[in-house]
Amino acid sequence: MLLDFGKFEKEKYSYICQDFDEAFYQALLMLKEKLRHYPQLVLLFSKNLKHPQSSKEYFTRFCEEQGFLCEIQEDIENLTVRKGVVYIAIKQQDVVKVVKQGRLEGLKCGRDFGLLAYNDIPSYEVIDEGITSLSIDWEMMGNEAANFVLNNVPIQKYLPTEVRLRKSL
């Protein structure tokens, strides 16, 4: 069984994948009205990030088609959080960095700047009144994988990306 990004030929294999391209784009579309409170979107995508590079293309496409200013920030260490910007963080450490840096700048998450995180975790429910996230259902992934292992039931599935809307947007 393959648990992966899914961008390769895999007809003969069982797999459970997360779509980081079109599903990412569609999730941004679902959040479009919330995102409109901020004129600029910044994707935090450090140079050595183990994440599909194609997400950058879908992010840029969304911004161009929907009329947002967009930026892909590779230097996360020297990040300055600015008013009127939504930060999209892929790594948990980047979520913490944005929240802490925003506080140092005297800015409030969800009012002065927005924050959208990849891969929901329980602490996102309580950090700064809640961090909006894009995530698959990890329990579903585990159940599907267990069913494959225990019952040898073949599977070829992309898990849906869910939006968990909280006060950070």
Locations of the language-model features?
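Short helix-capping segments at alpha-helix termini
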Residues: 63-69, 104-109
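A short, well-structured beta->alpha microelement
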Residues: 65-80
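Flexible, charged surface loops at secondary-structure boundaries
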Residues: 34-37, 78-84
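Hydrophobic alpha-helical segments within soluble ligand-binding/sensing domains
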Residues: 6-42, 95, 134-154
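Short, charged/polar "capping" segments at the starts of alpha-helices
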Residues: 9-10, 49-55, 94, 123
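Flexible loop/turn connectors
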Residues: 81-86, 93-169
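An alpha-beta-alpha
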Residues: 22-66, 157-169
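Structural motif
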Residues: 5, 44-49, 88-93, 119
